[in-house]
Amino acid sequence: MDGLNTGEEEDSAFTSISLTDDTDHSLKSLHSGAERLFPKMMNADMDAVDAENQVELEEKTRLINQVLELQHTLEDLSARVDAVKEENLKLKSENQVLGQYIENLMSASSVFQTTDTKSKRK
């Protein structure tokens, strides 16, 4: 019996190795780890793309608002130019009327007329 006991002691000293195919189990655990990792990476990538799109959208919105503001400013300036042109034409017309009036007054006044009598006195 000593031989049997010795054999049992020797067997317990060795590590038992399973002869079943463990590659399936290790691949499954690797695959499940990758499944957990990829969605996180995809979510992070999607978040980065979403943030990038959000920044781009905000920039486009800001530029559109700026363009609209500039268009309104241009319309206001154009209206002001038209008003100034009208006022200028009105003032030119009034100046012509006043110029003609002054010319008529000067020709009717004896102060501004040259007389032959003054030149004859000398």
From Swiss-Prot:
Subunit and interaction comment: Homodimer. Interacts with ARL1, ARL2 and ARL3. Directly interacts with FEZ1 and UVRAG. The interaction with UVRAG is reduced by amino acid starvation, but the complex is stabilized in the presence of FEZ1. Interacts with NRBF2.
Localization of this protein: Golgi apparatus membrane; Golgi apparatus, trans-Golgi network; Cytoplasm, Cytosol
Membrane topology recorded in Swiss-Prot or TrEMBL: Peripheral membrane protein
Protein family (similarity comment): Belongs to the SCOC family.
GO BP, one annotated term: regulation of protein complex stability
Main location: Golgi
GO CC, one annotated term: endosome
Pfam families the UniProt entry points to: DUF2205
Annotated coiled-coil segments of the chain: 43-101
Keyword terms: Coiled coil, Cytoplasm, Golgi apparatus, Membrane
Keyword Metal-binding: no
Its job: Positive regulator of amino acid starvation-induced autophagy.
Region (Disordered): 1-26
The keyword Coiled coil is assigned to this record: yes
Organism this protein belongs to: Rattus norvegicus
Protein name: Short coiled-coil protein
